[in-house]
C-alpha cells in the first residue's frame, strides 16, 4: 500500500501540474525564509513534515475510502458569496489594524458601521449564507470520518518540534494568554480551528467546483486564508516584507490541514489538528 500511495501522489501531480508548481514555488520561498532567518533546518523539517502528513493522509484514504462528498449546488454563485465574504472581512481588518488609522480615535459612527463586518472576518456571515442556502452540517463536512488521523499528526508534530526547534514551541505562551489549558483549547479549536477550517472548506469546495479544478481551488483558498493574517502582522512591526513572507510561510501547514479535510471528507480532523497546533514549527 505504501507503493500505491506514492503512485497516487505521482499521478495527482501529473494531473495538475499548475497546482504542483504553485506548491513548489511556495516551498522554495519557505526555504528562503528559513535561510533568511537562520532557521534553514527548521524550514526544511517543516516542509518535509507537511509532505509526510499528506502521505499519511493519502495512505489512510486509500485504505479506508469513503463515499461521502461535499455538496456544492451552485458553484459560481457560491464562489461569489465566498469571495464577497472574505473581501468584507479584509475591509474590517484594514480599518482595525492599519497603522494609518487609529481605531480608538475613529469616529464612533464609523466604528459602529464597521463592527458588523466582524461577522465576515470570522466566517459567521459565511455560515449564515450556507444555512440560508439550506445546507446541512453534514453537507459541509461535519462528519466523524478520519478522526484517527489526529493522533499521529499531533504526536509527530509535538515530537519533531521538541527535537528540531524547542524554542518555537508556543504551548506555554498560549496557556498563559488564555488562562489555562481549557482556555487554550477553546481558543485554538473554536476561535481558530473551527472558524478558519470552515472558511477554507467552503472556499476550496466552491472554487474547486467552479473552476473544475480542486487543486487550484484548494491552493487559492489557502493562499487567501494565509494572507488574511498579513494586516495584523504588519500592524505589529510595520514590516511589509516580513508580513508577506510570514503569510507565505504558513501556506504549507494550511495546505496540509485543508488536504486532511479533502481526503477524509470531514472538517473535524483538521479543526482539532489546527486547534491543538501549539508547537510552532511553522514559526521561523
Question: Residues of each region from the PLM?
Answer:
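N-terminal, membrane-interfacial amphipathic/helix-forming hydrophobic leader that caps
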Residues: 1-133, 283
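Transmembrane helix-loop-helix hairpins at the membrane interface
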Residues: 2-9, 24-34, 153-284
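Hydrophobic, small-residue-rich membrane helices and short re-entrant helix-turn-helix hairpins
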Residues: 132-148
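Short, well-ordered beta-to-alpha junction loops that form the rim of enzyme active sites
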Residues: 91, 144, 273-276
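Residue-level signature of transmembrane alpha-helical entry/exit and packing/kink sites
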Residues: 15, 19, 43-47, 78-82, ...
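Transmembrane alpha-helical segments in integral membrane proteins
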Residues: 127-134, 199, 203-205
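Alpha-helical transmembrane segments of multi-pass integral membrane proteins
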Residues: 82-96, 117-126, 148-165, 185-192
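Alpha-helical transmembrane segments with an aromatic anchor "belt"
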Residues: 71-77, 143, 209-211
